[in-house]
Amino acid sequence: MAIIAYNPTTEEELHFSCKAQCAKYFGLKANTVIRWLDNGMPVIELLTDPDRNKVEIEKQSKLNGFELFTIKEWLDYV
């Protein structure tokens, strides 16, 4: 499944062929990226979710401002 990483501040767009490739690029475990995308909530919203624990926020900080989308979510977003 194709994954798009988009940084709304810089408007930089990165394309990955799969979740594992995306995870490796950002220094995360593939299961982390899979869990975020399967959550059904844009990853950027997870950062502001008060119920998220400190570890999750630290993991998400590795995205450096990028938000992750599946290709379907991306097409709906743009």
Locate each region found by the language model.
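Extended, non-core accessory segments
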Residues: 1-78
